[in-house]
Amino acid sequence: MPPKPLFPNVFPGDGAPRKRRLALALLAVPGLVPAVSYAQLSGAAAQPQPLDSPWDLRLAPQLEDRPLKDGAKPAAFVIADHTSGTAEQDLAAKGSAELRRGDVVVKADAIHYDQDTDMADAYGQVRINNSGTSFAGPEAHLKIEANQGFMTAPKYHFNMTGGSGSAERVDMVDNERSVFVNGTYTACQCSTNPAWYIKGSRFDFDTGADEGTARNGVLFFQGVPIFASPWMTFPLSGERRSGLLPPTFAMNSSNGFELSLPYYFNIAPNRDLTLTPRIISRRGVMTEATFRYLSPSYSGTFTANYLPDDRLAHRNRYAIYWQHQQNFGGGFGGYVYYNKVSDTTYPEDLGSTNQFVNGTQTLYQQEAGLTYNNGPWSVLARYQHWQTLPPSIAPYSREPQLNVKYTKYNVGGFDFGAEADYSRFRITTADATEGDRIVFNPYIAYGVYGPGYFVVPKVQYHFASYDLNYLSSTTPNSPKRFTESIPTVSFDTGLIFDRSVRLFGQDFIQTLEPRLYYVYTPYRDQSNAPLFDSAESDFGLAEIYQPNTFVGNDRIADANRITAGLTSRFIDPRTGDERARFVIAQQYYFADQRVTLNSGQSAVQARHSDLIVGAALKLGSGFMSETAFQYNQNNNQLVKSSVGFGYSPGERRVINVGYRYTRSNTTLDNQPINQFLISAQWPLTRRLYAIGRFNYDLAGDRVVDGLVGLQYDADCWALGVGVQRAANGINSSGQQNSSTRVMMQLTLKGLSTVDNGLVSAFRAGVPGYTPLPPPPPPMSRFSNYE
């Protein structure tokens, strides 16, 4: 018996107009569409349907799939210029043929569909779309509902993720999995000549798992192979997936050429590990591991660097960083912060290779603690230790510390509270005083607040008890056990006036806010107390209204002074935004301050403090300015100044200019500062951005630090290059050493993103820096509806 012709010319509607093809095809094979056939034959079914009918149109925030009910079979729809077949058995269609069933759409010049086996054979300009994945090729054979079959010479596109490519053959395993033989893959959206692509002998794609695997894969960029691997995995979208990340490069003046090859392990949705072998040409191979974890009750990061047998230092080098936060519930918590390096020159030699260590860092905190916070109570119990590198002086460690705070507000108009602290201070420096200290600091205040004024009297008390188990040889006759009791009374008051003004054609609300702050603390001899945690407080607008000129609990300054200040603000009445602020303040002394930090210092003899002046402006078009001055009227000298300007008219457009000046002071043993700083991020073209930072020491006639970089943002890739000169350690004379490094970072959009320190350097060096934008999100599968 001769084979049955595939497209017999027996259908009477061959010459029907195009708009009638669908109806003719459905009438010819009614068994394929029982729901529609029943609607045509039954009068009741032809009546208007209720609102829950699946055929009704309704408003929806977004297009969504409507799955079939359990046991229901999707109907099959066929459109073609010519169709023929047997009811409920098979169908042949040719001429712009289309077959639709469920989520599957098949288009071709000719289609044969066997309903018994659910097998479709398509020939000539075949296009298959299934759940957002599109295939195009000359021939395909597919089981529609199971989505199992193959296509020759396919071109494919994942609408949900944006990936695409071609191959010699594709085998469709199910709705989510497919296997390509001798193919390519790219996430570039261009139709021809993608900037990057992966070529492999086999690709296994799983859109459900959002993962692709390439066998014998070679990564090409601009037609040049840059990486090869017998096996590589990569995400099909921006979601995290295990696999190789793009290599990163750097050049350092002390370490030579650096090449990093990171591999990312997506252990779980809330845990991941990045393992990075780093080849350092002059030193060897360093391995870095970064483990991150997150849960509703805890989170943290652990990073370790290890360099065996450093070829320059001739020893093993390592650095450890661990940060952990824990929530036990009920207000209880805990934390760990541990940072350690192997030796004193690690920051100078290898700080540029570690984002948690910089070249000038000399103090490494090692601390663990328990916390409790509930209402007015706040409790901290911790063990704190420091690793100190020269030339820094080791600070005291708290081994351990227990701190309890209680604070209540507006209890009958009163604010009151107390702080109790026990600390055992230890230090690694030889011949240094050590011991225990108990501190109790209660206070009570009564605030009266009105629409245009406030009055806040306050009484506080400082009690300290020392039990020293070792005395320094410089204080051999000091007592080991003693106590201190020091009261303090303060009175803070101010007025607030406002008026409407019009300046430069714009309406403002101007305020005038005079403020007086008086504090009295009697003199108590504190020369026996060691300096466990106390130091001179900075002097500025943030500190001028504080009762104590020292920080810490070992020194409470005697005081009989008043601070007078005046603030004026200009506020936009439409938005409430503060557009300008001007401040001037000064302290006036009724008695000399006799308490000093060290016994060898002389008492402060002055009638008034330096004058503090500050201003902040926020003008239109992104212009901002902040300025502060500290002026000594007795010597007619500028003690400190800080001037800063910022201009940011749009995204990735920012310019910062600053100047800092500090006059040297032999009493405070501080070094003079006279520095000029400029930093910027600005587009040179639509795709090319320049980044720069220049910090110049006018007094020393040297560059403190500098950064010059370029970033190019293409459609599916980005390239950044930067040259950075930064401080890298401190020499024996106390001066900073500098080193230069070159960094290059290539980002293949849609494949993976990793920062080798370039973006971090740009962000740290340029306030207001904005990274390049991410690639646009892939379109919904409904955007390319077939």
From Swiss-Prot:
The keyword Membrane applies. GO terms for cellular component: cell outer membrane; transporter complex. InterPro entries: LipoPS_assembly_LptD (IPR020889), LptD (IPR050218), LptD_C (IPR007543). Belongs to the LptD family. Component of the lipopolysaccharide transport and assembly complex. Interacts with LptE and LptA. Together with LptE, is involved in the assembly of lipopolysaccharide (LPS) at the surface of the outer membrane. This is LPS-assembly protein LptD.
